[in-house]
């Protein structure tokens, strides 16, 4: 199957800050790449030991929290959704609504890079659904279906 054409090659942190309302410490993606015409793309998160979550999760054996990976998936989906409708609609916000079929497969450690491979699995008006695979070095570490609503 041929891949859908790329609409946006790279959305850097400055563009993400213009697109999403999230800010440190809850902005959980560093960039989004390869946003395609089929509403798919890849969010990138560089996991650093300096992040606040590692003060308590877990000091002796730091592991990046799974719930933050799910939020990273949702933020990636939000950027894909907003960028995909840019020019035809002007949503002001994205609201994370649902999580389904969530599985955590392997721990993510400081120093690793997570790629959130997100693809649309449905859309109805302002509602979007995405399937996401979080990967480290090509290995799936978590997966989930997430739903969101774009508002104007």
From Swiss-Prot:
Example of a GO biological process term: lipid A biosynthetic process
Q: What is its EC number?
A: 4.2.1.59
Q: Keywords assigned by UniProt?
A: Cytoplasm, Lipid A biosynthesis, Lipid biosynthesis, Lipid metabolism, Lyase
Enzyme active site: 57
Q: What is its main location?
A: cytoplasm
Q: Which reaction does it catalyse?
A: a (3R)-hydroxyacyl-[ACP] = a (2E)-enoyl-[ACP] + H2O
Molecular functions (GO terms): (3R)-hydroxyacyl-[acyl-carrier-protein] dehydratase activity
Does Protein biosynthesis show up as a keyword for this record? Answer: no
- Which locations, inside or outside the cell, does it occupy? Cytoplasm
Q: Decide whether keyword Lyase is in the record.
A: yes
In terms of Gene3D superfamilies, this protein maps to: Hotdog Thioesterase (3.10.129.10)
Family annotation (Pfam families): FabA
An example of a Gene Ontology cellular component annotation for this protein is: membrane
Record SUPFAM superfamilies: Thioesterase/thiol ester dehydrase-isomerase
Q: Which NCBIfam families match?
A: fabZ, PRK00006.1
Query: What functional role does this protein have?
Result: Involved in unsaturated fatty acids biosynthesis. Catalyzes the dehydration of short chain beta-hydroxyacyl-ACPs and long chain saturated and unsaturated beta-hydroxyacyl-ACPs.
Quote the protein name from its UniProt record.
Answer: 3-hydroxyacyl-[acyl-carrier-protein] dehydratase FabZ
What lineage is on file?
Bacteria, Pseudomonadati, Pseudomonadota, Alphaproteobacteria, Hyphomicrobiales
């Amino acid at each position: 199957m041929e891949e859908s054409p790329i609409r946006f090659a790279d959305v850097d942190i400055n563009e993400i800050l213009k697109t999403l309302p999230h800010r440190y410490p809850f902005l959980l993606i560093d960039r989004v790449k390869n946003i395609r015409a089929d509403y798919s793309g890849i969010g990138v998160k560089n996991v650093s030991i300096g992040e606040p979550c590692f003060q308590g999760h877990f000091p002796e054996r730091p592991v990046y929290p799974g719930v933050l990976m799910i939020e990273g998936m949702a933020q990636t989906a939000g950027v894909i959704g907003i960028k995909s409708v840019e020019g035809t609609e002007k949503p002001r916000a994205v609201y994370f609504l649902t999580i389904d079929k969530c599985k955590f497969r392997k721990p993510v450690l400081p120093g690793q890079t997570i790629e959130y491979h997100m693809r649309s699995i449905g859309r109805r008006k302002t509602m979007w659904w995405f399937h996401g695979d979080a990967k480290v070095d090509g290995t799936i570490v978590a997966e989930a279906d997430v739903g969101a609503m774009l508002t104007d």
